[in-house]
């Protein structure tokens, strides 16, 4: 018994029929196209993650700058009140 109730002989017969219908060159081309599509998908996913990381870093820098500005204004306020 093979996959899902299909025996190994049935799988071999289907493989032979596919080879006869499409030929090896066309199957190689399809395999290459499929590999290229998978590679492109993975690249797009990693690019998306990199963009998300850059956005998070920019947000952290913005928050840090706002905190520094708030600290500076508080310090100036203290100086003016001390006078």
Curated annotation (Swiss-Prot):
GO annotation, biological process: protein transport by the Tat complex
Matching Pfam families: TatA_B_E
Family statement drawn from the similarity comment of this UniProt entry: Belongs to the TatA/E family.
Superkingdom of the organism of origin: Bacteria
Quaternary structure and partners: The Tat system comprises two distinct complexes: a TatABC complex, containing multiple copies of TatA, TatB and TatC subunits, and a separate TatA complex, containing only TatA subunits. Substrates initially bind to the TatABC complex, which probably triggers association of the separate TatA complex to form the active translocon.
Function summary: Part of the twin-arginine translocation (Tat) system that transports large folded proteins containing a characteristic twin-arginine motif in their signal peptide across membranes. TatA could form the protein-conducting channel of the Tat system.
Record region (Disordered): 50-83
Compositional bias segments (type: Basic and acidic residues): 50-65, 74-83
Organism encoding this protein: Saccharophagus degradans (strain 2-40 / ATCC 43961 / DSM 17024)
GO-annotated molecular function: protein transmembrane transporter activity
Transmembrane region(s): 2-22
Membrane topology: Single-pass membrane protein
Protein name according to UniProt: Sec-independent protein translocase protein TatA
Gene label: tatA
UniProt keyword annotations, A-Z: Cell inner membrane, Cell membrane, Membrane, Protein transport, Translocation, Transmembrane, Transmembrane helix, Transport
Major localization class: membrane
Subcellular location per the Swiss-Prot or TrEMBL entry: Cell inner membrane
Entry GO CC: TAT protein transport complex
């Amino acid at each position: 018994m093979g996959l899902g109730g299909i025996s190994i002989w049935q799988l071999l017969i289907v493989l032979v029929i596919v080879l006869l219908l499409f030929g090896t060159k066309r199957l190689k081309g399809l395999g290459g196209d499929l590999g290229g599509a998978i590679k492109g998908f993975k690249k797009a996913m990693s690019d998306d993650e990199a963009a998300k990381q850059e956005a998070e870093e920019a947000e952290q820098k913005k928050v840090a700058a706002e905190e520094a500005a708030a600290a500076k204004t508080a310090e100036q306020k203290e100086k003016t009140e001390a006078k």
